[in-house]
Amino acid sequence: MTNTIPSAEAYASEPVRFQPLVVVDLASEAAAVTDTYRNQVISQVNTTCLRLAVLAGDYPWHQHPRSDELFLVMEGKFEIELADGRVLRLRPWQTVVVPAGTIHRTRGVGRTVNLCFEAVAAETEFVEHNT
């Protein structure tokens, strides 16, 4: 298992895996991931994309200056830590919107699978943050 976090440029340029009118089995796609981190663009609807993310452990502090993110947890326990010290804890079938410009980091408590809806070319800015 690997835990490679892509660069901001690689994240923004991730290609769409499935074209319209293709049925996608998200459970099978998630089960095929053996890495501790994988975030892939499954499909695109207009200017928004659906990402499937598998995460175990921490993702670095960052923000998306011009894109909100909507997270929907499918499996496991998922946390979003905010710069002000709050921690949002989500379980399967819970969702939250993180507004554009919000400094945060995500964490999979064990293996976590979530869906993320965001702008197709959402910019990611990694930031220094002292906890």
Task: List each language-model region with its residue ranges.
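Ligand-binding loop in jelly-roll beta-barrel domains
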Residues: A100-V127
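Conserved short histidine dyad/triad with adjacent acidic residue
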Residues: D35-T36, C49-P65
